[in-house]
Amino acid sequence: MKRFLIIIIGGIAYGMALLFCGNIFELSDSQMKLLYICSAIAIFIITLTINLVYNFIYARKINKLIPLLEEEKYDDYIDKMTAIRNKVKSKYIRDTVQLNLTPALMGKKEYIAAVKILEELESDVRKVPLSDMVRRLNLCFCHFYLKNYDKAEALYINSKELFDRYKNIEIYHKNFVLLDLFMDICCRGKKEGLAERIKEARTKFTDKNLVGDFDYLDSLLEEKD
């Protein structure tokens, strides 16, 4: 409602400014039309530039917090992310912050809280393929840890086309290797060669935050023996 009122007031002020200029400079109808077009284009460009700069500044602030996540300082990470979320006006940035909160919640094993956020974001991030991929990927992992295997499998199948766009990109490849291991153990009923695949992945991907995932996969495999 507040934004709607601002738009109305801004539109009225813009119209009055154009009329004022037209009266002061005694502009003809064609000159007024040209003034309207040029000023509208200028306002659009200025607004777009301000929005891009605003989003860029906060995107950098978010990226600077990633080391806290890698160091498993989850509470500190969540506090700082939440402070950004509560401060920003941009809905896009707020959604990005919400999405970036979920890995920390997952690191703290608060999977139900992470699922709630990820499901609430569905309609908001659907039009941004990368954000939607990350949302779906994290949601798959949450379902696996909550042992909601039917939901995890259904989401995986529904997301396969989107996942295939990103699975071979270096920064995401390890996550999809992990996801396929979960699928093979929990949904596809595979056992043969999985211990070796987990060991190979553990050797290849040495990120500290993946150790717990590999340990959990080993424990799932042991349960099947």
Please describe what each predicted stretch is:
Residues 59, 63, 99-100, 134-145, ...:
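"A position-specific structural signal for the A-helix of alpha-solenoid helical repeats
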